[in-house]
Amino acid sequence: MATELRADGRVLENWNPENEETWDSKIAWRTLWVSTFALTIGFCTWYLVSAIAPVLNDIGFDLTKGQLYWLTAIPGLACGLFRLVFMFLPPVIGTRKLVTMSSLLFLIPMFGWFFAVRDTSTPFWWLLVLAFLAGIGGGVFSGFMPSTGYFFPKRLSGTALGLQAGIGNLGMSLIQFVGPWVMGFGLLGLSFVAPQTNNSDGGTIYVHNAAAVFIPWAIIAAVLSWTLLKDVPVKANFRQQIDIFGNKNTWILTIAYLMAFGAFSGFSAQFGLLINNIYGRESAFAETFDPATLPAGASFAFLGPLIGAGVRALWGPLCDKFGGAIWTFIGGVGMTVCTAGAALFLNPSHPDQFWWFLGFMLGMFFFSGFANAGTFKQMPMILPPRQSGGVIGWTGAIAAFGPFIAGMLISSVGAPGFFWGCVVFFIIATTLVWIYYARPNAPFPG
């Protein structure tokens, strides 16, 4: 006879999602929505730098293209490192304290960038420090996702994790859309902060607004988390958690997720700069065409993460129905083809070729949503419950280095070398997914 669920305290007693008698769907879904709200603010924090970097030189900073690529790459490096820490926290401190603490940590880089952009003499090294701190926003992913996984049965894991990751990923698009928009006017309560001059058009611009606009929402997330969330008594020490590295599926799924989310996050962080440097006002076309007629990275940068995150959120139920492996495979094939197509337009002869480049890039983001949703459905199905949370955290940590890898390689080998290198890596990863998971009679279907 099942032990009765006790949910009156802060810690859920006898919680077992696989048994209807010891699972409460209301608690599970409430946990999902509150932590997803906090995760969305976290991803806004992570990609704050990519929204601000394209306009820094317009307000008086004197940064090279290489320095701007590094600024947008450092949050990815930091995120990966932070995820290696956060992946161990869910069974140690519990969901409630984890989400609350994380929401408060988002305030540090927000306030830091608010003050930094006000002073154009801010040294580059300090901008790098603030960029590193922004990585906290993405780092919490490897804590939130395993934590949410404790609350749902396997049959709903694809839907739950797909919704959380997909909606959370929308924060990347949200900040790149809202950030440039709120730079255009004074925010309520901040009208006393004088705007800066936009050297590109002579107008005024409120760059600090991009850092300030989500501060109230981070505080709300902390309050909601502390008052509404509960903890699941899943306990595991460090030694018990690192046994995931003896399972070969950990490494194959890491490669697959590095393709899926690593590329999604890496291209998202660099998308605006790539547009500006190849087709926009920083490109060679600016010498012969009116810069005002050339595409602006800030106008298109949000589209990629919006599409990829939206598809990821919507595809969770389909992964529950058909399995994740086939969608990871289809996503990998599509990403390979679209990235190769985009690579053909990295040395354009006319600005009109931009639309081909944009189309292929948005196609790559679209298929990344398939692959991201698929891999996160596979993990709980292939791995035992205690290991699946750790593998979700680990793969998320490694894939989070995507923005850093993208920025580092683009600045060192150039965009064409980076794009074609991605094509080769995608082929390898997709082949592994087919051999081990997606083909008929695969050894580990999921």
Please report, for each region that a protein language model flagged, where it lies by residue:
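A late C-terminal transmembrane helix in Major Facilitator Superfamily
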Residues: 172, 382-415
